[in-house]
Amino acid sequence: SNSLFEEVRPIVNGMDCKLG
């Protein structure tokens, strides 16, 4: 269940880093 969130968190973190 948390697997999906754990797999999506790095993507969101990468996007945030790119935006910042």
UniProtKB/Swiss-Prot annotation:
First-tier enzyme category under EC: hydrolase
The record's account of how the chain is modified after translation: Gamma-carboxyglutamate residues are formed by vitamin K dependent carboxylation. These residues are essential for the binding of calcium.
Enzyme Commission (EC) number: 3.4.21.6
UniProt protein name: Venom prothrombin activator notanarin-D
Function: Snake prothrombin activator that attacks the hemostatic system of prey. This protein is functionally similar to blood coagulation factor Xa.
Tissues and organs where the protein is expressed, per its UniProt entry: Expressed by the venom gland.
Organism: Notechis scutatus niger (Peninsula tiger snake)
Gene Ontology MF terms: peptidase activator activity; serine-type endopeptidase activity; toxin activity
GO cellular component, one term: extracellular region
GO biological process: proteolysis
Location, primary (coarse class): secreted
Family: Belongs to the peptidase S1 family. Snake venom subfamily.
Biological classification of the source: Eukaryota, Metazoa, Chordata, Craniata, Vertebrata
Subunit structure: Heterodimer of a light chain and a heavy chain; disulfide-linked.
Keyword annotations of the record: Blood coagulation cascade activating toxin, Calcium, Disulfide bond, EGF-like domain, Gamma-carboxyglutamic acid, Hemostasis impairing toxin, Hydrolase, Protease, Prothrombin activator, Secreted, Toxin
Residues bearing PTM 4-carboxyglutamate: 6-7
Further comment: Is classified in the group D of snake venom prothrombin activators, since it requires the mammalian factor Va for maximal activity for the cleavage of prothrombin. The venom of this species does not contain its own coagulation factor V-like.
Reaction catalyzed: Selective cleavage of Arg-|-Thr and then Arg-|-Ile bonds in prothrombin to form thrombin
Locations listed in the record: Secreted
Gla domain sequence ranges: 1-10
Ranges where the Peptidase S1 domain occurs: 11-20
